[in-house]
């Protein structure tokens, strides 16, 4: 691969690898809680603490393919930097959700809602990139610079709760 191609995806790859490490951390928590309760073997049933860790992990795993799809679509079709920033924010929010779920379930609600907003932002970036592609294809009009400016300007607003 040439440097330009790698430069167009390197931030997305970094966010993806960080998310893999986070998934490993979540899986380790499930395994640790299972072994704490059940000795050496892994079982899906156990104490309330294990049920919470297991459910929080499953909820994060269920949303993971959607996150990866919109992260890479937004980064490739629209703009890499705002997509990577939103991806990092999503990982922080997912961590907050996971830790919050281990305590009171109401503590996980802000992370869940914030995560949905970030997924929506990445989805809209992807749609804008696809829309721009078809504008170029059919009409020869390229709004890529405008879309990049808007997404770069809006992405810090994801920090507002």
Curated annotation (Swiss-Prot):
Cytoplasmic face of the membrane: 31-52, 103-107
InterPro entries according to UniProt: 5_LipOase_AP, FLAP/GST2/LTC4S_CS, MAPEG, MAPEG-like_dom_sf, Membr-assoc_MAPEG
Main localisation: nucleus
GO cellular component: a single term: endoplasmic reticulum membrane
BP-aspect Gene Ontology terms: cellular response to calcium ion; leukotriene biosynthetic process; leukotriene production involved in inflammatory response; protein homotrimerization
Transmembrane segments: 9-30, 53-77, 81-102, 116-128
Positions in the Lumenal compartment: 1-8, 78-80, 129-161
UniProt intramembrane stretches: 108-115
UniProt topology in membrane: Multi-pass membrane protein
Domain of life: Eukaryota
Keywords: Endoplasmic reticulum, Leukotriene biosynthesis, Membrane, Nucleus, Transmembrane, Transmembrane helix
Family in the record: Belongs to the MAPEG family.
Full protein name: Arachidonate 5-lipoxygenase-activating protein
